[in-house]
Amino acid sequence: MVRGPRNREKLQGYYDLYMKTGQIDPNVNPEIAASWQKSREVNPPTDRIRTDCRLSPETFAARQKLHRDAMMYLKHLTTGLRDFFKEYDISLLLLDDECVVLKSYSMPFYQMTPGEIEGVRVGLEQIGTSSVSMACELQTPFWVFGPEMWIRESHDSDACSA
């Protein structure tokens, strides 16, 4: 879901209110509000992404092999776009149906290099509300603005979409 520009200070205020009191401001997007509630229930960390939900090297290699065609397609598709990704600080990740990062094709995701993030599960249970968890839940691309994300280190981001 593509959404119009949002006021960062207001979004930060909504997030802070929810984190302190559990109260959701009526101006919070309903899908974001529902995701915040689910995030609070599963209680992922709020400070930064953890990589302890990483697949074993053998399991990860098997998943990559299963999705080899998609990985090769994106590799060829993104070859000419790397400068664009770099200029606009865009991350492009290929995830499987369990939100495991199969391949990182561009800029670091949450300041994590491809070697750090590949093989890591990044679903709602692991990182809370994010563009990834929203797209997975709603089965459609979703635009999430910095202060709406569960992980505080992402609050300075302009926006993320998945």
Predicted regions: what they are:
Residues M1-V122:
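Intrinsically disordered, low-complexity terminal regulatory regions
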Residues Y88, D97-E98, L102, G115-A162:
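Sensory/regulatory domains in signal-transduction proteins
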